[in-house]
Each structure stands twice: as structure tokens, then as C-alpha cells.
Amino acid sequence: MAAALQVLPRLARAPLHPLLWRGSVARLASSMALAEQARQLFESAVGAVLPGPMLHRALSLDPGGRQLKVRDRNFQLRQNLYLVGFGKAVLGMAAAAEELLGQHLVQGVISVPKGIRAAMERAGKQEMLLKPHSRVQVFEGAEDNLPDRDALRAALAIQQLAEGLTADDLLLVLISGGGSALLPAPIPPVTLEEKQTLTRLLAARGATIQELNTIRKALSQLKGGGLAQAAYPAQVVSLILSDVVGDPVEVIASGPTVASSHNVQDCLHILNRYGLRAALPRSVKTVLSRADSDPHGPHTCGHVLNVIIGSNVLALAEAQRQAEALGYQAVVLSAAMQGDVKSMAQFYGLLAHVARTRLTPSMAGASVEEDAQLHELAAELQIPDLQLEEALETMAWGRGPVCLLAGGEPTVQLQGSGRGGRNQELALRVGAELRRWPLGPIDVLFLSGGTDGQDGPTEAAGAWVTPELASQAAAEGLDIATFLAHNDSHTFFCCLQGGAHLLHTGMTGTNVMDTHLLFLRPR
């Protein structure tokens, strides 16, 4: 926690307006104590889904080291283990797998983001790196998370390895978010450029992510169960780190080891809907015309075991345990927070106000209208399994400090050229919302952080705020509305109190979306 404590000197040096001095020192100390606890909980959430712990929970060897157990399945090991992987977190996953199973590993190929090895070396995260003479070949590509020639070479190497396997072999597949861009393998004669152009045109005309994935799978050799088909008749164990709300295995990295449920008619329907069927390249028409109704039929995936080994749910569960150990009543609201960042910020701001009335009954309570508005915002966000009533009841009966936890990914409509990410923007918007409501004798802190350690094109993972944010910003001449209008949340937090509110972790080597923490502590 040394890094977290470094913010104390910066805050001590930060200018305080004379009118704000009375009581500011006490509130500052309280905020810093909450901020330190928030960082602890965030780090515990990330720690629960780091590659090493995840792989060791998912895999185990018998005492003789000749049998691999995955869930309730056993696989014989006799120098027959092969490994492939693709995704932003796969380098560390492969390193953990090599540490556990290296003596049985014959060959491996992984596709990871460009520059990730150097970044891990700079961060001193040796546990995320393969051994010097590893049997796993590493390809770096997909710069800026876009398919490119380097990623294509990696995908073809993965395909070649899979196609050479026999019924006696076992293929371990490591998958994480970002895997789709790192596994581009168009069906010939379609080229990578033609496939990219088509998906860009569809996106520009309003196609949904589900529709885009349907087209990608239909034109790919490896997506939509294609990798599983290539590896047949070998046994396939797919270990998946989910960065998608709800953990749908067919969506994560476009489901290379999950049979596609879509057919050519689905593709043609999508292309017709967006007026692109007539303008298709000849190569795309050729592939679609010769494809079977179900190119990677379900029968090809009976030899596959797909296992989610890490998710936002697991990360939040660990943070909840840590919060309870610190004396908080902790409730997980949802691991599927999604929707517009403005609406989400309004929800968290109003939730803090309504929660305050439950924790401090002597204060004026939330009006019926405010209570109804909170539920309307929740309905607008369409959050599945939202535990809002449980959270409010916990506060009404407990009367102690409360920590509300959530995870997911809000969406941000870009309207400016500033620097930031969805976590810093959400935190800034929540900070602006908190000033709208009288919170009384209660300390409130909100933190939003990306579990991969990188929020947008910045070096911060996220940020934390308190109800004093608006007055702190005004004291330093910072106009919150102006920064939000330009999506410039990172610049704002860099300027505010010397960057003390930024959450810095460095690249974590994992990714299970974002973590939101709302602390409410009666004084």
C-alpha cells in the first residue's frame, strides 16, 4: 500500500480555500482512510483473478503428475500436452500454465498484444513472463486492439498446431478479452482487409456487436468453433477469462471453441438489413455461397471442455470478503453494470443520497419521489439481477458502515478530444452528482477502476471521489462541466491535488471489466 500512501504528502500540499479550512483537516483524514481501504479492496478484486491464482484453482495434478484434473474431468498426461492462447491476459496465463505443466508441454503458440512483454518487464512482473527457453512461441500483434498482419501470422501458426494434433493429444486453450482481434483468420479467398472493411461498414451503419460477431464467425476459420474443429480429434480444454457481462462463452473472443448457432441465412439477413449484400466483394460471396448451413456444426465440439476460470463475479466476491473483514456490511449490487455513463453516475449519486437516509434515520429521509427516481434509473440501465432492495434493507437494519460493490462496463459517448477512460469519467460524473444531494454526517467515497490497470489511453486504472470534489475543484479553478464536455477526465484528475485521486496499479496482466466501490460510513 506504499503507493497509495504517497498521495498523503501531495494532499497536504494541495491548496485549501480559507473558507473551507474549518473541518477540512478532519474530512481529509477521513477521506484518506476511506481511499486507502478502497484501494485495498480494488487490489484484492484484481488479485483474485490474476493468472497464477486462477490457473492453480482451475488445474491440478495427481501426486504422480500423470493426470490433469479440470473440474470433474481427468486427462492423461504422457508428453501429449499442447498449448495455444490469445488475448490481453494470455501471456501471464501461459506463464502460469508453463510453471504448473511445463514437464508435459510439447509445444505452444500464443498471440498477445504488441509490446506487452516489454511492459511486464518494465513493471517488474516476472511472474507474467515465460521462461527464457520456453516451448511456447509468442507472437505480438493487434496494435491498438485492431487485427493486423502480425496477428494473422499468429492465428495461422495456432491453426497449424491445432490441425496437426491426434486423438492421443490434449490441447489447452487460453482465452481472454481482446482475443478476437488477436485471432484473425479469414476463410480464403477472403482477405483480412476485406473482412475488416465489411465489419467497419456494418458498424458505421449501426450493426450491433452481436450482428458483427455473427459476420466475423461466418468468415473466420477459427472463430465460432473453428479452432475446436481444427483440433479434432484431440481433446480440448479451454480456460476462459471473461471480460463480457454475463460471461457468455460464445461471445468471449468470438467463441473459437464454442459451436456457432448461426448460419448463412442469418448473415444474409444482416447484410440485407444494412444494404450491403449487393456490394459484397466476390470473395465474401464465394465463402457464403459454399458454406454449409452450420459450418462448425455442434457435433464438432463434443471433445471440448469450456471453463470460465475468472470473471467479474469472482473479483467482486473477493472484494466483498475483504470489505466484511474491515467491518463493513458489504453487498454486491451487480456484476453486470452497463449502459450510458451519465445515467450510471446519476444512479450512484442518488443511491448515495437514499442510502444516507437509511443509515441516519434522524436526518430528513429521501422523498417518495427520490426513491421512485432511483428505481426508474435502475430500470433504465436494465441491470440484470440488481440487488438494490437487499442493499437498502441492509442499510436500514444495520446502521453501520456499508460498502456497495458492482462491476461491468458503462458506455461513453465521445464528444471531445480529451484524455480519459470510462472509469475516470464515471468517477468524475459521480463526484459531480454527489454535490447535488445533502449527505449529512456521513463519509462517502466512490471508486471506479479497470481491472486491467489501464483506463482508456492513460496510465491510470481509474479514480476515486468524495462529495467534496466540487469544492476542491473550485478551489483550484477547475470547472468540472468543461472537462466532462471534452471527455477530459484524466486531465482533470491530473490537475486536481497533484493527481492524488487517480488510481495507479500499472498493467495487471488480467481483465474482468471494471470494479465500482461505494463506501458510506456514518461519522
From Swiss-Prot:
Organism encoding this protein: Homo sapiens
GO molecular function terms attached to this record: ATP binding; glycerate kinase activity
Residues with PTM Phosphoserine: S60
Record-linked Pfam families: DUF4147, MOFRL
Disease with which this protein is associated in UniProt: D-glyceric aciduria: A rare metabolic disease characterized by chronic metabolic acidosis and a highly variable clinical phenotype. Clinical features range from an encephalopathic presentation with seizures, microcephaly, severe intellectual disability and early death, to milder manifestations with only speech delay or even normal development.
Keywords linked to the UniProt accession: ATP-binding, Cytoplasm, Disease variant, Kinase, Mitochondrion, Nucleotide-binding, Phosphoprotein, Transferase
GO-annotated biological processes: fructose catabolic process to hydroxyacetone phosphate and glyceraldehyde-3-phosphate; protein phosphorylation
Enzyme class per UniProt: transferase
Result for mutant: F493C: In D-GA; the mutant protein is not expressed and has no enzymatic activity
InterPro entries attached to this UniProt entry: GK-like_C_sf, GK_N_sf, MOFRL, MOFRL_assoc_dom, MOFRL_protein
Catalytic activity reported: (R)-glycerate + ATP = (2R)-3-phosphoglycerate + ADP + H(+)
Coiled coil stretches, renumbered: none
Domain of life: Eukaryota
This protein's GO CC annotations: cytoplasm; cytosol; Golgi apparatus; mitochondrion
Family: Belongs to the glycerate kinase type-2 family.
Enzyme Commission number(s) of this protein: 2.7.1.31
UniProt note on tissues of expression: Widely expressed.
Gene name per UniProt: GLYCTK
Protein name, as recorded: Glycerate kinase
